[in-house]
Curated annotation (Swiss-Prot):
The keyword Secreted does not apply. The lineage of its organism: Bacteria, Pseudomonadati, Thermodesulfobacteriota, Desulfuromonadia, Geobacterales. InterPro entries: Ni_insertion. Keywords: Nickel. One of its GO terms (molecular function) is lyase activity. NCBIfam families: nickel pincer cofactor biosynthesis protein LarC. Belongs to the LarC family. It comes from Geotalea daltonii (strain DSM 22248 / JCM 15807 / FRC-32). It comes from the Bacteria. It holds the Pfam family Ni_insertion. This is Putative nickel insertion protein.
Length: 390
C-alpha cells in the first residue's frame, strides 16, 4: 500500500504541500494541464516552482503568480466550479472535502449558514490552486493512506481581511479541533487554514511516523524564513505491506460502585456526543464485595482531557486512568446504496481493496422501519440481501 506521511515539524500550508509533492514526482506540466480543467482563465495566473534553501536544507518553493485584484468567492461558487470541471472524480472528491471543511469552519466562526460563507484569502485563485493542486498530487502519486504528525500551533498575530487576529486564526483553530497539536514552537503562523483543511479532510491517521519502506522524500518551503527552524514541510512517500490501517488512540478507564445506573446511560450518550470512538460498561466485583461498573472509553488522542473531564463531571468517579494504545483497523466507508425500500446508507468494509462485507447502518434501518411500517429485523434482512456484493 502506498502511504504518505506529512511531517509538519515547522507547520503546513497549501503551497508547501504542492511544492513537496513536486519533489516527490508530481510533474509541473501535469499539474498545469489538470488545473486547466477548472476553467479558470489561464491569463489570470502563472505557476512557478523554484529551488530554495531553508537553514541550509534544499527544498522547492511553489508560487501562484496572480493578478493583483482577485475576486472573493462564495463557497457555493467554488463547489460548483469543481463539480462542473472535467477533473477526475477522485480529484473532485478530495478537493470538495477540503473546501467543505473550510466552509464549515468559517460558518461556525462567523455564526452563519454554510451556504452564506464568503471566502476572502481562501477564495482567491492561489488558494484554489493550492487546494486542488494538493488533490491532484495525491491522485497522481497514487496515495492510499495519509498519515499526519502533530501540528505546531505557533503564536502571535496575523493581519487578515477581518483585521488583526491571534494565531492560530479562529477558522484554523476550528479546523484543528480533534487533531493532535502542540505549542512547542516559536512565534508566527505555522499552520494556515488551507494547510489545516488539507490534513483535516484527507488524513487517515494522526500521530507518529507509520512503519513503511521509504521510497522518496520531498521538502516544500514556506515563503517566510523563521529564525528557530527551517520553514519546511517534509512529505515522506513509502510502501507498506500492511493491509490494515494503524491508528493511535487513548483508553480511559474508571471504576464506579456508587452511581445510579440510569445516569450511566446518560454518561455514555454524552461521551459519544463529544467524540468518543467507543464506550463500554463491564460488571465488576469491587472492594467490600460491592458490585460495580468498569467504564472504558476509547478516544482520539486529542480528546483525552476533554472526555476525562466529562467522566468526572457526569459521574461519581473521582479519578480516571488513561493509557495510550494502538489499533489496527480495516478500511471502511459509508456509502449510499439503492434498495427496494429506497436509498440507504451502508458501511462498506474492505481489506487490501477486497470487499469484506457491507453492513447496514442501524439508524438508516430504524428510519426505514418508521417510514415503511415494517419490523426492524425485516428491514435488516432486505437491505443485507439487496446490497450484498454490490
Amino acid at each position: 500500500m502506498k502511504v504518505l506521511f506529512f511531517d509538519c515539524f515547522a507547520g503546513i500550508a497549501g503551497d508547501m504541500t504542492v511544492a513537496a509533492m513536486v519533489e516527490l514526482g508530481l510533474p509541473l506540466e501535469h499539474l498545469r494541464r489538470e488545473l486547466a480543467r477548472l476553467g479558470l482563465p489561464a491569463s489570470t495566473y502563472e505557476l512557478a516552482v523554484e529551488p530554495v534553501r531553508r537553514k541550509g536544507v534544499a527544498a522547492s518553493h511553489f508560487e501562484v503568480r496572480v493578478e493583483q485584484d482577485q475576486p472573493h468567492r462564495h463557497y457555493a461558487d467554488i463547489a460548483a466550479m469543481i463539480d462542473g470541471s472535467s477533473l477526475a472524480a477522485t480529484v473532485k472528491d478530495k478537493a470538495q472535502r477540503i473546501f467543505r471543511r473550510i466552509a464549515e469552519a468559517e460558518a461556525k466562526v462567523h455564526g452563519m449558514e454554510i451556504g452564506h460563507v464568503h471566502f476572502h484569502e481562501v477564495g482567491a485563485v492561489d488558494s484554489i490552486i493550492d487546494i486542488v493542486g494538493a488533490a491532484i498530487g495525491l491522485d497522481y502519486l497514487g496515495i492510499e493512506a495519509v498519515y499526519v504528525s502533530p501540528l505546531p500551533l505557533g503564536s502571535g498575530y496575523i493581519e487578515t481581511a477581518h483585521g488583526r487576529l491571534p494565531v492560530p486564526a479562529p477558522a484554523t483553530a476550528e479546523l484543528l479541533k480533534g487533531l493532535p497539536v502542540h505549542g512547542n514552537i516559536g512565534s508566527g503562523e505555522r499552520v494556515t487554514p488551507t494547510g489545516a483543511a488539507i490534513v483535516a479532510a484527507l488524513g487517515t491517521a494522526f500521530g507518529s511516523h507509520p512503519p513503511m519502506e521509504i521510497r522518496s522524500i520531498g521538502y516544500g518551503a514556506g515563503s517566510k524564513d523563521f529564525a528557530d527552524m527551517p520553514n519546511l514541510l517534509r512529505l515522506v512517500l513509502g510502501e507498506t505491506a500492511e493491509t490494515l490501517q494503524r491508528d493511535e488512540i487513548v483508553v480511559l478507564e474508571t471504576n464506579i460502585d456508587d452511581m445510579n445506573p440510569e445516569l450511566l446511560g446518560f454518561l455514555m450518550e454524552r461521551l459519544f456526543e463529544k467524540g468518543a470512538l467507543d464506550v463500554t460498561f463491564s460488571p465488576l466485583q469491587m472492594k467490600k464485595n460491592r458490585p460495580g461498573t468498569l467504564v472504558t472509553v476509547i478516544t482520539p488522542c486529542a480528546k483525552r482531557d476533554e472526555l476525562a473531564r466529562l467522566i468526572l463531571s457526569e459521574s461519581t468517579a473521582i479519578g480516571v486512568r488513561y493509557y495510550p494504545a494502538q489499533r489496527l483497523i480495516l478500511s471502511r466507508t459509508v456509502e449510499e446504496r439503492l434498495t427496494s425500500l429506497g436509498p440507504v446508507k451502508v458501511k462498506v468494509v474492505t481489506d487490501d481493496a477486497l470487499l469484506r462485507r457491507v453492513v447496514p447502518e442501524f439508524e438508516e434501518c430504524r428510519r426505514l422501519t418508521a417510514e415503511k411500517g415494517l419490523p426492524l429485523m425485516d428491514v435488516y434482512r432486505i437491505v443485507e440481501r439487496e446490497v450484498a456484493g454490490t
